[in-house]
Amino acid sequence: MRMIIVSGRSGSGKSTALDVLEDNGFYCVDNLPAGLLPELAERALINTELAEPLLAVSIDARNLPSHLTRFPQMLDEVRSRNIQCDVLYLDADEATLLKRFSETRRRHPLSTADRSLAEAIRDETTLLGPIIDLADLKINTTHLNLYQLRDALKLRLLNKPEPGTAFLIESFGFKRGMPVDADLVFDVRCLPNPYWKPELRDHSGLEQPVIDYLSAQADVEEMFQDIFSYLNKWLPRFAASNRSYVTIAIGCTGGHHRSVYLTERLGQVLQQSLKNVQVRHRDLS
């Protein structure tokens, strides 16, 4: 049986996450009281109609504070039943959450006459602290639109073929912000930039003209070898420490050329020695 617990601050994309999981065969329960988590898991296990139970539940700040405080004990109880249980935590920066609430005109679950929206958003982080501390996967949705979020959820949650650490190697452009949910970040802006070659500007690091140009640069090859040596040594240590998810981000200026090229190469070589290696290009349209 597989269970995914979805949590996060209001406006971060929890409803979208449940929609994606439901579309892919999960039985979803929104706003489950944390105290009922072990009972729900037990009932799903004994339900003979479910050959391979897939269960997703949303637990967030609408819970009683006392239930959230007991979340670590509830999670231990679920996992003691040999259930593969992942905790997904979604978040976005405060300005983005404020903007989303302003656009939808929805009421924040913690807002009151004496508590502003900004205060409610900040208080939510404190309430969800026990879940944040135990999250296996954190996704920051600040720079993601609806379709990008759906794709990210499918890649990280549904393309994980077996238990163990899932490694995501992600290219990005610094001009759109650094991915705050990355565990390791490599800055490759010091490398020769194909953008300044007019004949290469409209190509990406996935296309042969850019590949040929970058593969001929000694600095690029040296950077690749250094990053690969580091990851090849230390990623198995992450896996040995029972981490469920590790994100490695490779950044250049725009996220179209250098970071894409290196991310593709690293993904190809690391897939030969590690299981569950995924590649994503955040800023390629």
Curated annotation (Swiss-Prot):
* GO molecular function per UniProt: ATP binding; GTP binding
Presence of keyword GTP-binding? yes
Q: Supply the alphabetized keyword list.
A: ATP-binding, GTP-binding, Nucleotide-binding
Which residues does the annotation say bind GTP? 60-63
Q: Where does ATP bind?
A: 8-15
Coiled-coil segments, which residues? none
Q: Does the keyword Nucleotide-binding apply?
A: yes
UniProt family annotation: Belongs to the RapZ-like family.
Q: Which PANTHER family match?
A: RNASE ADAPTER PROTEIN RAPZ
Q: What does this protein do?
A: Displays ATPase and GTPase activities.
Q: What is this protein called?
A: Nucleotide-binding protein PSPTO_4456
Task: Say which species the protein is native to.
Answer: Pseudomonas syringae pv. tomato (strain ATCC BAA-871 / DC3000)
Could you read off the lineage of the organism from its UniProt record? Bacteria, Pseudomonadati, Pseudomonadota, Gammaproteobacteria, Pseudomonadales
